[in-house]
């Protein structure tokens, strides 16, 4: 579904000739046919779909730009677009304040900016200002409603990397990725081109931009997928459980977000929140003292350590849960992490609660030396008493990455071991293995899917159904919701 038809409309003036594949060619705007979608039929003017192949050249921009629906689409929005060559740039609109900015140095973009400013200065916006959307609605609902109501065109409009006067195929260098709330769709039979002229002579232009610079500049708006490099709108990313909208890849998730989606509201009771490391071996690196580094991560993440532990309810079932956070020193396991997990398991043993530990760690924390390695044995000992002696139920959830001492200890000790899709799970990393053994590690040999077929753990469960899967597992092992226990008693 196209969202950018309005962007191309600003290109259509006496210096920017923009051709479309329309149903027929004619000399006046009034003759343009109505679209097939009844919602789009305007008794005054309407833009046709993209399906047919004849050409029509627009000579004025007022008709295109002063359609009343344009004010239902944009007010104050930033859009990031990327073409098939990987070049990206951003477009910022603020029509109320007469601001139009494009983050690129191309003279073509300067042409657009100049034209847009002159358009606003003509006072055209007053005519249709009352059609601006109501700001009481959320951005998401506004965009969704606009798309559903007005943009059911079959038109494929985009800006080419090489702008020429010839008609070319849509797939040959046109912008194919429009970063908004939905992915772009196009009709392969359509074609479009843009020709610019300066002082009577034609010339070609190419937009160039650095993806990394744009990602840094707009990272407060977008989250880039590690797998497909697609961009996800940050406001909606948490509600989608940090799953990429483009490819379904599971990105890293903070411990607080995991607790929020896993534990029932108003049931979370944290344990040992104030426990912090005292730098037992007085580790000092050339770059930064260990204590300063701990303080830095505490300010950055709002956590005291690389794990949150506590008691809560999962669909009404009381549980003890520990969630590691990779954002805090790579989720490394030091003395505090080991002590908090041990206390959690001991509490669950005394209260006969099921235990969940969500693993996301690079392994033992080197800044605490052998003391961090001892946490592996300590946790394993507490887990043995919990599982073998008390016959209670422990579920281990392996997320990306789970490596080192965590994999070698409590990560693989669960009665049921669950992995997330595409999770990186290993004891030693690929680089370490290759440098130590002088052997090449095949790509994908440390992914959850490969290890699942080798029998390393039980199911691979995506985040969306995970809470329901855990609830069924607990009930299967005799852990029932509190309200159900009361009814049976």
From Swiss-Prot:
Cellular compartments annotated: Plastid, Chloroplast stroma
Top EC class for this record: transferase
Zinc finger motifs (C4-type), residue ranges: 225-247
GO aspect biological process, one term: fatty acid biosynthetic process
Main localization, broad class: plastid
Cofactor: Zn(2+)
The protein's annotated pathway: Lipid metabolism; malonyl-CoA biosynthesis; malonyl-CoA from acetyl-CoA: step 1/1
Domain of life: Eukaryota
GO cellular component, one term: chloroplast stroma
Amino acids binding Zn(2+): 225, 228, 244, 247
Reactions it catalyzes: N(6)-carboxybiotinyl-L-lysyl-[protein] + acetyl-CoA = N(6)-biotinyl-L-lysyl-[protein] + malonyl-CoA
CoA carboxyltransferase N-terminal domain ranges (all copies): 221-489
Key words, A-Z: ATP-binding, Chloroplast, Fatty acid biosynthesis, Fatty acid metabolism, Lipid biosynthesis, Lipid metabolism, Metal-binding, Nucleotide-binding, Plastid, Transferase, Zinc, Zinc-finger
EC number: 2.1.3.15
Stretches with biased composition (Low complexity): 185-201
Family annotation (PANTHER family): ACETYL-COENZYME A CARBOXYLASE CARBOXYL TRANSFERASE SUBUNIT BETA, CHLOROPLASTIC
Protein name per UniProt: Acetyl-coenzyme A carboxylase carboxyl transferase subunit beta, chloroplastic
Species assigned in the record: Dioscorea elephantipes (Elephant's foot yam)
């Amino acid at each position: 579904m196209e969202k950018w038809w309005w962007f191309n409309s600003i290109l259509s003036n006496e210096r920017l000739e923009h051709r479309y594949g329309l149903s027929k060619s004619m000399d006046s705007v009034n003759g343009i046919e109505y679209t097939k979608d009844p919602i789009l039929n305007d008794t005054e003017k309407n833009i046709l779909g993209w399906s047919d192949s004849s050409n029509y050249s627009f000579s004025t921009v007022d008709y295109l730009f002063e359609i009343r629906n344009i004010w239902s689409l944009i007010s104050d929005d930033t859009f990031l677009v990327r073409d098939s060559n990987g070049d990206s740039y951003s477009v910022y609109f603020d029509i109320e304040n007469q601001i139009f900015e494009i983050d690129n140095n191309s003279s073509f973009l300067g042409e657009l900016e100049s034209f847009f400013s002159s358009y606003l200065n003509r006072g055209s916006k007053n005519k249709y200002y009352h059609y601006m959307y109501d700001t009481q609605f959320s951005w998401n609902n506004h965009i969704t409603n606009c798309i559903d109501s007005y943009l059911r065109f079959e038109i494929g409009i985009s800006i080419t990397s090489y702008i020429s006067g010839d008609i070319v195929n849509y797939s040959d260098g046109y912008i194919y990725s429009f970063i908004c709330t939905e992915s772009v769709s196009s009709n392969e039979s359509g074609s479009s081109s843009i020709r610019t002229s300066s002082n009577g002579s034609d010339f070609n232009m190419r937009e160039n931009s650095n993806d990394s610079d744009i990602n840094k500049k707009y990272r407060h708006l977008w989250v880039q997928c590690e797998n497909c490099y697609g961009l996800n709108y940050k406001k909606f990313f948490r509600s989608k459980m940090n799953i990429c909208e483009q490819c379904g890849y599971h990105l890293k998730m903070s411990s607080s977000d995991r607790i929020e989606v896993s534990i029932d509201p108003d049931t979370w009771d944290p344990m040992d929140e104030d426990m912090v490391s005292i730098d037992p071996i007085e580790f000092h690196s050339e770059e930064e003292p260990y204590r300063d580094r701990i303080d830095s991560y505490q300010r950055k993440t709002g956590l005291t350590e690389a794990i949150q532990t506590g008691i809560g309810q999962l669909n009404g079932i009381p549980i003890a849960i520990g969630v590691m956070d990779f954002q805090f020193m790579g989720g490394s396991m030091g003395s505090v992490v080991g002590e908090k997990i041990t206390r959690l398991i001991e509490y669950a043993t005394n209260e006969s609660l099921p235990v969940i530990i969500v693993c996301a760690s690079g392994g033992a924390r080197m800044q605490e030396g052998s003391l961090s390695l001892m946490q592996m044995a300590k946790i394993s000992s507490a887990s043995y008493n919990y599982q073998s002696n008390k016959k209670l139920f422990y579920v281990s959830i392996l997320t990306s990455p789970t490596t080192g001492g965590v994999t070698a200890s409590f990560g693989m000790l669960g009665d049921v071991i669950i992995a997330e899709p595409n999770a990186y799970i290993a004891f030693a990393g690929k680089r370490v293995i290759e440098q130590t053994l002088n052997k090449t590690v095949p790509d994908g040999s440390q992914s959850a899917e490969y290890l699942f077929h080798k029998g390393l753990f039980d199911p691979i469960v995506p985040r969306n159904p995970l809470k329901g899967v855990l609830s069924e597992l607990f009930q299967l092992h005799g852990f029932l919701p509190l309200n159900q226990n009361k009814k049976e008693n």
